[in-house]
UniProtKB/Swiss-Prot annotation:
GO terms for molecular function: netrin receptor activity. Coiled coil: none annotated. Residues 1-26 form the signal peptide. Residues 48-145 form the Ig-like domain. Residues 865-943 form the Death domain. It is found in: Cell membrane; Membrane raft. Highly expressed in brain. Also expressed at lower level in developing lung, cartilage, kidney and hematopoietic and immune tissues. Residues 707-725 are annotated as: Interaction with DCC. The lineage of its organism: Eukaryota, Metazoa, Chordata, Craniata, Vertebrata. This is Netrin receptor UNC5B. It comes from the Eukaryota. It comes from Homo sapiens (Human). SUPFAM superfamilies: DEATH domain, Immunoglobulin, TSP-1 type 1 repeat. Induction: By p53/TP53. The keyword Repeat applies.
Length: 945
């Protein structure tokens, strides 16, 4: 009722303002006069324009809030709250003139109390808006919502104290209490506010959790989660984080001397638990602080004299002598030498000798004589050495002088002929190579054939003189042109396709078509990947694709390989366009070398160019051949550095916040979220010898056979589309066809080889040229994954050309493992039509590049609604974390938590997973299970369209 009376009053007031008494009087006095045809009119007044609109407000405790609005030109302004007009008495109105326009500005203000808000029933919040009138009409302002502010006392989840080792990641969870407006969260470390911009070791996630990337000793502290809004401020219980250090042993000291100088004893060495010392309750070092071991010191043996020898004959000096040796035993192990003299002499004439000689028993006389002889010999040796040195020096001087005079008259004809360059290691081809003379003999496809042959020039007659001048020795090299051929192994196999010009023009004959291989092509390609100039990048249409993308994103796909690159919307900065490429590296040299039980599980894929600025991760999809259900794998993603060596990017299930990517592992493919483009490969390692790789076996035979020999080639390949496609391309060049559909084989990490054998051959018409009962492919050749097109060849010979039917069995199995049997029946006179073409055009899209919205299944508008609804965490938990769980992408949620829009990254990954046959139904089902019915309606509507 009050609202109606207020409306009536407003209408009456408007009529009074429009009524002019002078017009009424004139009509009364001269009612009989004719009215003029027209009246002078004032300029039309515009619609009211709001200078100030009411803003959202919160009622704190019992204090009412004020809502105000200003508009011009306006004759009246009234508030309408929840669809009903506010009483005129509740309005406070002020009027003024706008200095710039001279128009009348009206300002109205009302108060909304807590009681008014609480009296409202229904799901909608209390709202008010202004309605302004002018002679031109009315204008409505925005709705301002008035809510009662509050903040609950109890946190939904409080942080818990932890003890963590040094350098480990720490996660402290906090869910603030419910409140209006939503509480802001900050973390305190010992009562100091944590600012991640100042200390990058801290990270605050979108759901208010605190992550310490690498725990330091200084991070040992008390942590408190604080939630606050305009009403109150709440503190959680304090969580104490203790960063401890486990003790580590120092290096062992040197062994002490043996305790016993002679015989058996013991010695010890020590170490201390100081590397590092245990801190903050860390564990003490395990093991002994000292080691003790037995030792044996060989006892010293003192020397002893032997018996004296017999006396010698009497000499001219009238003396005879005798000797002894210190050999009974000799001194050993540091024992003392014998004391006494070696020689003993005495007069042998009983004093009748008249000569006065020194007795031989005088040791000093013998020593003097010996020293004199030594000096004499030394002097002679020195003199001879000096004379020889002088003679040699004179000879060298004379020789050099003669050579200098002789060289001025000599012309080196060989140097003139070759221009100062000498050929090194010229080798001619061997024409006796059976692979070249007999194309029917099956080649060994496991050996690569990247052979370079340069032009051969005939040497000139040595009698011809070429004068030496100051001109360059060699003319400038002509520009280089590289012709690229697909793989071929027989001498008659022509090249299939020419590559793009990479460097220029090369003289004809540099690369013969019968020996050109993909290996050289890929070496040249990988050498140029660092450049962002894509015009000179050689491209193989079957293994590479490129496209230009902007901020709307898109998708690159290599048909028939399962390799693709998804560029999400917003990954490329606004206003920029990148030409991006995706290629599969075919050369074996582009794969990492396997170490131990490690194996390559995917092709080596390059996406580029490197160094691009990306605003959000792109998704690279690669097929793999691991049997993930075995659950005995250690999976790793590796990237190739600029120096060519491979580096580990991430080990699955060992991610940290510093991990630069995320891997979503599916049964047959892995989807990798990348911030940096480059060359990547997926590898695995078995840690208990029970991991299993998926292989596929394919049997090929010649499409036409005009000789008595007939070859069956059995390939053992990784179970990926890329591996089969490469072999199909190879066999097309060899003129082979696929005898039977490829069969799968589970190959176990057991060190057992793969054994192939031929059975049930009709010996009346055929015979096998294989001498052994079976062939084997070594285990490591298969398990490493770095060798391509592994195969064995069974060469058969028919007794006559009239034999055109061949039936046999080929058994392929791993020793003590699984196997497959091929039952072959073929007719040599017939060529199965399209057997290779059918597989080469296997299922899968042939579209290589999709741009903008055409590359995505979720429309941008629906995607934005889903992100807005799920990005913000809530107490019920039906946010982006539950979406990741429903879509089986919750292996490491912290990766998504660090992104500005976790939901957006999850939806990007979902787009990559649904490339081939996905629709919106799976996403709609996940949203329905989460209780997001409003999102479900939008998704279902778009899905029906």
């Amino acid at each position: 009722m009050g609202a109606r009376s207020g409306a009536r009053g407003a209408l009456l007031l408007a009529l009074l303002l429009c009524w002019d008494p002078r017009l009424s009087q004139a009509g009364t006095d001269s009612g009989s006069e004719v009215l003029p045809d027209s009246f002078p009119s004032a300029p039309a007044e515009p619609l009211p324009y709001f200078l100030q609109e009411p803003q959202d407000a919160y009622i704190v405790k019992n204090k009412p809030v004020e809502l105000r609005c200003r508009a011009f030109p306006a004759t009246q302004i009234y508030f309408k709250c929840n669809g009903e007009w506010v009483s005129q008495n509740d309005h406070v109105t002020q009027e003024g003139l706008d200095e710039a326009t001279g128009l009348r500005v009206r300002e109205v203000q009302i108060e909304v109390s807590r009681q008014q808000v609480e009296e409202l029933f229904g799901l909608e919040d209390y709202w008010c808006q202004c309605v302004a009138w002018s002679s031109a009409g009315t204008t409505k302002s925005r709705r301002a919502y008035v809510r009662i502010a509050y903040l609950r006392k109890n946190f939904d989840q409080e942080p818990l104290g932890k003890e963590v080792p040094l350098d480990h990641e720490v996660l402290l969870q906090c869910r603030p209490p419910e409140g209006v407006p939503v509480a802001e969260v900050e973390w305190l470390k010992n009562e100091d506010v944590i600012d991640p911009t100042q200390d990058t070791n801290f990270l605050l996630t979108i759901d208010h959790n605190l992550i310490i990337r690498q725990a330091r000793l200084s991070d040992t502290a008390n942590y408190t989660c604080v939630a606050k809004n305009i009403v109150a401020k709440r503190r959680s219980t304090t969580a104490t984080v203790i960063v401890y250090v486990n003790g580590g042993w120092s290096s062992w000291a040197e062994w002490s001397p043996c305790s016993n100088r002679c015989g058996r004893g013991w010695q010890k060495r020590t170490r201390t638990c100081t590397n590092p010392a245990p801190l903050n309750g860390g564990a003490f070092c395990e093991g002994q602080a000292f080691q003790k071991t037995a030792c044996t010191t060989i006892c010293p043996v003192d020397g002893a004299w032997t018996e004296w020898s017999k006396w010698s004959a009497c000499s001219t000096e009238c003396a005879h002598w005798r000797s002894r040796e210190c050999m009974a035993p000799p001194p050993q192990n540091g024992g003392r030498d014998c004391s006494g003299t070696l020689l003993d002499s005495k007069n042998c004439t009983d004093g009748l000798c008249m000569q006065n000689k020194k007795t031989l028993s005088d040791p000093n006389s013998h020593l003097l004589e010996a020293s004199g002889d030594a000096a004499l010999y030394a002097g002679l040796v020195v003199a001879i050495f000096v004379v020889v040195a002088i003679l040699m020096a004179v000879g060298v001087v004379v020789y050099r002088r003669n050579c200098r005079d002789f060289d001025t008259d000599i012309t080196d004809s060989s140097a003139a002929l070759t221009g100062g360059f000498h050929p090194v290691n010229f080798k001619t081809a061997r024409p006796s190579n059976p692979q070249l003379l007999h194309p029917s003999v099956p080649p060994d496809l496991t050996a690569s054939a990247g052979i370079y042959r340069g032009p051969v020039y005939a040497l000139q007659d040595s009698t011809d003189k070429i004068p030496m001048t100051n001109s360059p020795l060699l003319d400038p090299l002509p520009s280089l042109k590289v012709k690229v051929y697909s793989s071929s192994t027989t001498g008659s196999g022509p090249g299939l396709a020419d590559g793009a010009d990479l460097l220029g023009v090369l003289p004809p004959g540099t690369y013969p078509s019968d020996f050109a291989r993909d290996t050289h092509f890929l070496h040249l390609r990988s050498a140029s990947l660092g450049s962002q100039q894509l015009l000179g990048l050689p491209r193989d249409p079957g293994s590479s694709v490129s496209g230009t993308f902007g901020c709307l994103g898109g998708r690159l796909s290599i048909p028939g390989t399962g390799v693709s690159l998804l560029v999400p919307n917003g990954a490329i900065p606004q206003g920029k366009f990148y030409e991006m490429y995706l290629l599969i590296n075919k050369a074996e040299s582009t794969l990492p070398l396997s170490e131990g039980t490690q194996t390559v599980l995917s092709p080596s894929v390059t996406c580029g160019p490197t160094g691009l600025l990306l605003c959000r991760p792109v998704i690279l999809t690669m097929p793999h051949c691991a049997e993930v259900s075995a659950r005995d794998w250690i999976f790793q993603l590796k990237t190739q550095a600029h120096q060519g060596h491979w580096e580990e990017v991430v080990t699955l299930d060992e991610e940290t916040l510093n991990t630069p990517c995320y891997c979503q592992l599916e049964p047959r493919a892995c989807h990798i979220l990348l911030d940096q483009l480059g060359t990547y490969v997926f590898t695995g390692e078995s840690y208990s010898r029970s991991a299993v790789k998926r292989l596929q076996l394919a049997v090929f035979a010649p499409a036409l056979c005009t000789s008595l020999e007939y070859s069956l080639r059995v390939y053992c390949l990784e179970d990926t589309p890329v591996a089969l496609k490469e072999v199909l391309e190879l066999e097309r060049t060899l003129g082979g066809y696929l005898v039977e559909e490829p069969k799968p084989l589970m190959f176990k990490d057991s060190y057992h080889n793969l054994r192939l054998s031929l059975h049930d051959l009709p010996h009346a018409h055929w015979r096998s040229k294989l001498l052994a009962k079976y062939q084997e492919i070594p285990f490591y050749h298969i398990w490493s994954g770095s060798q391509k097109a592994l195969h064995c060849t069974f060469t058969l010979e028919r007794h006559s050309l009239a034999s055109t039917e061949l039936t046999c069995k080929i058994c392929v199995r791993q020793v003590e493992g699984e196997g497959q049997i091929f039952q072959l029946h073929t007719t040599l006179a017939e060529t199965p039509a399209g057997s290779l073409d059918t597989l080469c055009s296997a299922p899968g899209s042939t579209v290589t590049t999709q741009l903008g919205p055409y590359a995505f299944k979720i429309p941008l508008s629906i995607r934005q609604k889903i992100c807005n609804s799920l990005d913000a965490p809530n107490s019920r938990g039906n946010d982006w974390r539950m979406l990741a769980q429903k879509l089986s992408m919750d292996r490491y949620l912290n990766y998504f938590a660090t992104k500005a829009s976790p939901t957006g990254v999850i939806l990007d990954l979902w787009e990559a997973l649904q490339q081939d046959d996905g629709d919106l139904n799976s996403l709609a089902s996940a949203l329905e299970e989460m209780g997001k019915s409003e999102m479900l309606v939008a998704v279902a509507t778009d899905g029906d369209c």
